[in-house]
Swiss-Prot record:
Expressed in lactating mammary epithelium (at protein level). This is Calcium release-activated calcium channel protein 1. The chain crosses the membrane at residues 90-107, 122-142, 176-196, 238-258. The record marks E108 as: Confers selective permeability to Ca(2+) ions. Pfam families: Orai-1. It is a multi-pass membrane protein. The gene is Orai1.
Amino acid sequence: MHPEPAPPPSHSNPELPVSGGSSTSGSRRSRRRSGDGEPSGAPPLPPPPPAVSYPDWIGQSYSEVMSLNEHSMQALSWRKLYLSRAKLKASSRTSALLSGFAMVAMVEVQLDTDHDYPPGLLIVFSACTTVLVAVHLFALMISTCILPNIEAVSNVHNLNSVKESPHERMHRHIELAWAFSTVIGTLLFLAEVVLLCWVKFLPLKRQAGQPSPTKPPAESVIVANHSDSSGITPGEAAAIASTAIMVPCGLVFIVFAVHFYRSLVSHKTDRQFQELNELAEFARLQDQLDHRGDHSLTPGTHYA
């Protein structure tokens, strides 16, 4: 009998521990996972936000809306302050200019003592000048009294300082000064220009026997007789021309003032409707917030 052949030598060392292969394969798997995904030292992901119930969501929405409403109210107050300041500045400049011009026009006008003025012309001219100066000085007085207080508040860089401004309480006085300076004062100024033209040019007329330096005496007499027969002197013609020009300008001014006022009122009305809609939305949210405990909520009614 032949002896049995020895088994072939094994490539693996039987004396090596079995745990070595498992540790090597585990390190390979860990390196593979670390190479494929995030590094092993990365912080864990934050937990998802907790579910918000419907009453809590209503409360958060209401607080956010009220915060936005507070900021919008402050912005609206600042816009009103800047608008009031601009109106007062424009009123003061316009009133000072037009009243000064009216005073100079009344003082510098030279009346012809030899001319027989119509009885009502000088009275109307004097009354118009006096009312014009009084209206503009009243608007200038309001602007001078209120404007420094508004300027002092507008120069302070603080959002809450708008409450210290008197523009809300003095709103009617500001609008009155604006109307006196821009509407009534401008119309009186146009009338003042027309009356000044009549007072200045009405005495100008050519004498019947006065020769003209550029024409022969015979021709001057013919022209003078023609002007006397027509009944319109050169001064009257100049006054009538100025009146014919100023009357359409006054009508255009009145139409523009009415159109501007209607457009401004329409814009303010639209803004009031928008604010009323916002207040209705606030009231709805407040009502839902007040009655959130009256309705029983199921556990599944959540907003993620």
